[in-house]
A protein has these predicted regions:
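Terminal amphipathic alpha-helical/low-complexity segments used for targeting or macromolecular assembly
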Residues: 1-63
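Structural signal for interior beta-strand "rungs" in well-ordered beta-sheet cores
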Residues: 60-148
């Protein structure tokens, strides 16, 4: 429950479009997708993988957000305009991370084992960023994709 409170606070702090905690709780799909993932992840860890994947699939249908239930997500997370977000099974997202839309933390085709990126605390990942493989980003930085 602390993660839910922390996520609500951080959305209000970092997103100028958020007019209240209630507004976020009821309407912000990034917040809702993150909380749904927290439920699915708990089920995944309990071995209730079919139910966890069912929740993930429903979240994908509703919000166009694909966070594998095996992925680990820290607290104080902001998922802003989160359409097109994809996070693989072995990905890890640290605390105080902000992620914008159309972002991928994916693998490179490896069938098993550790195959997804690890994002450290305090990272901002801009829209359209694609990070593949077992790359570890362990310090505060801003990742940006620039299109010309």
């Amino acid at each position: 429950m602390d993660s839910v409170k922390d996520d609500l606070k951080v959305v209000k702090e970092r997103d100028p479009a958020c007019i209240s905690h209630v507004h976020c709780f009821l309407n912000f799909k990034g917040f809702l997708a993150c909380q749904s993932h927290r439920v699915a992840h708990k089920l995944w860890l309990q071995g209730r993988k079919a139910l966890a994947v069912m929740i993930q699939n429903r979240v994908f249908e509703i919000f166009a957000v694909g966070i594998h239930p095996g992925a680990k997500i820290g607290s104080r997370i902001l998922l802003d305009h989160v359409t097109g977000l994809v996070v693989g099974e072995t990905a890890v997202i640290g605390n105080n991370v902000s992620i914008l839309h159309s972002m991928t933390l994916g693998g490179t085709g490896k069938a098993s084992g550790d195959r997804n990126p690890k994002i450290g605390d305090g990272v901002l990942i801009d829209a359209g960023t694609c990070i593949l493989g077992t790359l570890r980003l362990v310090f505060v930085l801003r990742l940006v994709l620039v299109l010309w």
